[in-house]
Amino acid sequence: MIVGVAYAKPTVQVWKHVDVPDTATARDAIEKSGLLDQFPEIDLSTQKIGIFGQICPLEKPLKEGDRVEIYRPIHPEAELLEKRS
């Protein structure tokens, strides 16, 4: 089945389509996408992930067409800058 894996930084957004087995989990799709190699700062032990904006565990089974999203942590400095604008 084909699913998407998305990751965004302030300067770049990546959305890859990957072909995974019908029994694949969100972790499987992320690993197969190559994003962990492309963006070594991704740490799945601390960063949250979701499917279509809904937080989920890495072991969540996927369905055809799902979009797995890797979320970046929000830093307090970013929140302060936003409030000052």
Curated annotation (Swiss-Prot):
Domain of life: Bacteria
A Pfam family annotated for this UniProt entry: Ub-RnfH
UniProt record similarity statement: Belongs to the UPF0125 (RnfH) family.
HAMAP family, A to Z: UPF0125_RnfH
Name of this protein: Protein RnfH
Source organism: Rhodobacter capsulatus
Protein encoded by which gene: rnfH
